[in-house]
Amino acid sequence: MRWIFHLGIALLLMTGCASYERQTAAFRGAWNAGNVQKASELANMQVYDKSDSHDGVIWLLEQGAALRANNQIKESIYAFERAEKRMRHYESQAKIRVSKEATALAVNLESVPYEGRGYDRVMLNTYQALNYLHLGQRDAAMVELRQASDEQDAELIRNARRISSARKSAGRYRSNILRTQNSAGTRNQLDSLQPSLNMDYGAFVNPFTDFLHALCLWSLADDQSENAIVSLRRIYQTLGQPRFIADEIKAVDKILSGGKHPDLTYVIFEIGVAPIRKEVRLDIPLFDQELPYVTAEFPRLENRGHPLTCAVVIGKNKIDAMVICEMDAVIGRDFQSELPGII
């Protein structure tokens, strides 16, 4: 029995700003051409030049993903470790970060360092788990998957904190801002920033990470099949009750009833590139005599590429892949949650 699914996930894990898009032209060209060796070499050079820049985190993440694609697993682990360390540093300076973001809205988003979004952290740990599985280090892989699960929960708290801080920073303009938000013209402008989602997995949920964690729980960890089946049932509902998850649940049920572990082959397709953040200049009325309006750069997601169908052919048998995660949807949901704080 074989299961094939594809993950609408990108080598470009992050959604950088306009300046980053310009910087990555050669890198993206190599990746889109399937030249992962060239892509990893370009990422290495960019990290050497820009590891301490505003785009340092994003380049370390790109480097880790490119090296992994080029089968340089140990080097990929090191790159991701550096990225994680940098993101933790930014997280420890949360109060400073909030003030910087508030100031940047009056200027432009390029002035703010890219510190990593919640989905970056989750995918970092997920890729690290895959790296360790590649090296046969099961315990290390389980640690990364548990951390990825914890990061999904932590992002709920981070987002609530961001929105609360943004509201406090509004200060005396709060009533004017509410009036602005309720005006028809402004509402139309702000609605144009909302991403279009084909799927909604819920706040800060990555179904692929959850599935991989459940898979490792029942196949690698001792006495974790019950936890795995709980996770699989949650994923089953999140994805709209797909057949392959239903069959996965049946397989784990058999194990819980004393059956043997089945011999399975899982084929994972990773396709596409992540959406990128564009800056849109909007003139927003504030209904204040001293500050009648403000011109600011607001972020808007722009999807890139289009979905592809994937399949595996074994002899005369063709097995079509099923989508388990669209990163466009994961990133778009995160973006939707972030917008109230920005606005």
Language-model features: where?
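Structural motif corresponding to the intra-repeat A-B loop/turn of tetratricopeptide repeats
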Residues: A33, N70, L135, L220-D222
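Bacterial Sec signal peptide processing site at the extreme N-terminus
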Residues: T15-V36, M45
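N-terminal amphipathic/basic membrane-interacting segments and domains
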Residues: A25-G29, L60, Q152, R158-H213, ...
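Amphipathic alpha-helical segments of tetratricopeptide repeats
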Residues: N44-Y48, E84-S92, S149-Q152, L156-I157, ...
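Start-of-helix signal in alpha-solenoid helical-repeat scaffolds, especially tetratricopeptide repeats
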Residues: Y20-E21, H54-I58, E115-V122, D200, ...
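Bacterial N-terminal signal peptides
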Residues: H6-T15
